[in-house]
Amino acid sequence: MSEIFDAKAFLKTVTSQPGVYRMYDAGGTVIYVGKAKDLKKRLSSYFRSNLASRKTEALVAQIQHIDVTVTHTETEALLLEHNYIKLYQPRYNVLLRDDKSYPFIFLSGDTHPRLSMHRGAKHAKGEYFGPFPNGYAVRETLALLQKIFPIRQCENSVYRNRSRPCLQYQIGRCLGPCVAGLVSEEEYTQQVEYVRLFLSGKDDQVLTQLIARMEKASQDLAFEEAARIRDQIQAVRRVTEKQFVSNAGDDLDVIGVAFDAGMACVHVLFIRQGKVLGSRSYFPKVPGGTELGEVVETFVGQFYLQGSQMRTLPGEILLDFNLSDKTLLADSLSELAGRRIHVQTKPRGDRARYLKLARTNAATALITKLSQQSTITQRLTALAAVLKLPAIKRMECFDISHTMGEQTVASCVVFDANGPLRAEYRRYNIAGITPGDDYAAMNQVLRRRYGKAIEESKIPDVILIDGGKGQLAQAKAVFAELDVPWDKHRPLLLGVAKGADRKAGLETLFFEPEGEGFSLPPDSPALHVIQHIRDESHDHAIGGHRKKRAKVKNTSTLETIEGVGPKRRQMLLKYMGGLQGLRNASVEEIAKVPGISQGLAEKIFWSLKH
């Protein structure tokens, strides 16, 4: 590789999620592996003018390529970073210690057990959880546990000599067992058991027990206690939703696929003993017009059946694409491996979340690859040439979304010379039209958007109308009737009709509503920018429509009850532990809430029941 690494173009494609990055030199050798809570922020730091050290300068000078693997938590990134360092032994990494010196979380065997970090021999009485990749991972986990399960983390010397609780008790990070009377033995023991289960990966048992306690507290009308337990349940759920380590110690290969602009990315996550060991993105050569199913099927067959990967076959392969010959593939792999290999395409639970992670990484890698091949500037330049324009400095695109004509929303997205200008994206609620009339919806949104004064810098060079000839005719009619102070003839109106079976790459473009349109090659940078802005508009419209539909569906019945304002609504939900608790309450129980009369309680009761 002799080309200079384009850091600016690369950083535009990097996500702000946690993950791991690998840096390669001109020979394709991994020279550094790192992890980050925010990949974009961390990687940007390498390309500043004032670098922190000569080592970093020497490293950056040799970078020819960077791969990133997105993870869902920083802890997962730490584990993955460690596995990559062990695998590649990069010369710019400090090599970590071997497993025998790794830190553990220690739950002591004291009367009031404490949590702490432990290294070395395991002589002390208590339980050890780990090992963790480094001390930072342990400290991060301890801080998390302290927020959810407030058992003590202080040294025994401090614990034995306190006469009043410390600041940790005041801010809710410790139950204060050091001072008699602050917490019962039963409650402290219960929280210790939650910690034990949580660190053992038994999150479901923790949630089951907490939910049972919350329901009992609600039945006993101990609403403050129920609310505290509810907050604890929510905290546990927030954490467990982000954990992607299987309790079953599974051996899996998880294959996610992304396809865009004539290019495919197949991302494989390798999971052994329930832990993500690493991942890799593959970019198979895809002839024009190839179906995505064929891409996946061919790749999987070559990847596993050519022999080099056979000895690493897992017990299960997860795919995010439903293969027509799934059974044949599974039988062939099983025969080669001498044991049963399962191929799943619709997994649930942890497996579904692994698949989502693989899909996320595939999409991220593909975005980076496409960006490296053709930047947004190059694409806009190519489109300007196709449209015979001197330049395209601003481009706007419209789309309509509704369900059976209801909750119609129009979207407008804006691109400038640097790509998406999300601060200027707009949604328009469409009203006063015949349900399902997309032409009327397009007519309305264009009049609202352009039937007023517009700054010179915000007049678009191109207006893309998603929908083909009919929608383009509406746009032409609207612009013909506009009476505005700006040059309404400046924007070029361009219609785009989806191809047969709505396949990307087969779009037809129209300058006029009459006559034949024209198409661009699937690998055309001009077509890629059209697809990009159209997809952004489509997603923006659908997002707005879903929010509007959800608002109608989920508007609390309480908001429609006369006499129940925001303060009373908040009081009701607080005392009843949420809307479900209120629905289950009797008139007498509702009337006990401060500020709620017997008459209003009856009105609330019957409104919720009917």
Curated annotation (Swiss-Prot):
For this protein, the record's CDD domains field holds: GIY-YIG_UvrC_Cho (cd10434)
Q: Which residues form the UVR domain?
A: 204-239
Q: Which UniProt keywords apply?
A: Cytoplasm, DNA damage, DNA excision, DNA repair, Excision nuclease, SOS response
Superkingdom classification of source: Bacteria
Cellular localisation: Cytoplasm
Boundaries of every GIY-YIG domain copy: 16-94
Q: Which InterPro entries match?
A: GIY-YIG_endonuc (IPR000305), GIY-YIG_endonuc_sf (IPR035901), GIY-YIG_UvrC_Cho (IPR047296), Hlx-hairpin-Hlx_DNA-bd_motif (IPR003583), RuvA_2-like (IPR010994), UVR_dom (IPR001943), UVR_dom_sf (IPR036876), UvrABC_protein_C (IPR050066)
Give the molecular function GO annotations. Answer: DNA binding; excinuclease ABC activity
One biological-process term from Gene Ontology? nucleotide-excision repair
Q: Which GO terms describe its cellular component?
A: cytoplasm; excinuclease repair complex
Q: Which Pfam families match?
A: GIY-YIG, HHH_5, UVR, UvrC_RNaseH, UvrC_RNaseH_dom
Q: Which family does it belong to?
A: Belongs to the UvrC family.
Q: Which HAMAP family match?
A: UvrC
Subunit organization: Interacts with UvrB in an incision complex.
Function statement: The UvrABC repair system catalyzes the recognition and processing of DNA lesions. UvrC both incises the 5' and 3' sides of the lesion. The N-terminal half is responsible for the 3' incision and the C-terminal half is responsible for the 5' incision.
Return the protein name: UvrABC system protein C
State the taxonomy lineage: Bacteria, Pseudomonadati, Pseudomonadota, Gammaproteobacteria, Enterobacterales
